[in-house]
């Protein structure tokens, strides 16, 4: 009993000390105008994707081998969903998806959230429906989540990573 109490008190003291030592975030690192500009960039990204403007889409991404797109894969050895690193791989993936048939991205702009992580990095999150016929998808609108990390490059904000995740169906209620 004494050992249990001692362990509990020690853990409590360590945990409380760790929380007290954590720096408090007091201010958003990006101002409202910057967050609004990133939201506008997101809207432009969606418009370019829906118009299959591959050249302009290329310009929206950070030009780096570290740029990442997570998307559906058509190659079974890559798995069902995969990461595509670097601009050449991303350009090819976007071209393959866009050339497969109709692709429509419909973000729920009322739920679009953009936050600053640092003065030079932001993150956006939005649920959306995507209609696509790529890689065994049947062209039916389905729910997805899109998470983008934005990087300030000079005066512009570029997509450093775009992660598209399918929302799994709600399990049937057990009765």
Tell where the protein language model's regions lie, with residue ranges.
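Bacterial N-terminal signal peptides
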Residues: 7-16
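Short, cysteine-centered beta-strand-loop-beta hairpins and adjacent loop/turn segments enriched
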Residues: 101, 131-140
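Positively charged n-region of N-terminal signal peptides that target proteins for export
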Residues: 1-4
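Hydrophobic pocket/interface hotspot
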Residues: 45, 57-58, 90, 124, ...
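A solvent-exposed, acidic/Ser-Thr-rich amphipathic alpha-helical stretch
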Residues: 36, 54, 58-116
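Short, low-complexity N-terminal intrinsically disordered segments enriched in polar/charged residues
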Residues: 20-60, 76, 173-175
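Short beta-strand edge/turn micro-motifs at domain boundaries
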Residues: 123, 142-173
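Hydrophobic/aromatic beta-strand elements that line small-molecule binding cavities or substrate pockets
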Residues: 109-114, 128-130, 145-151, 164
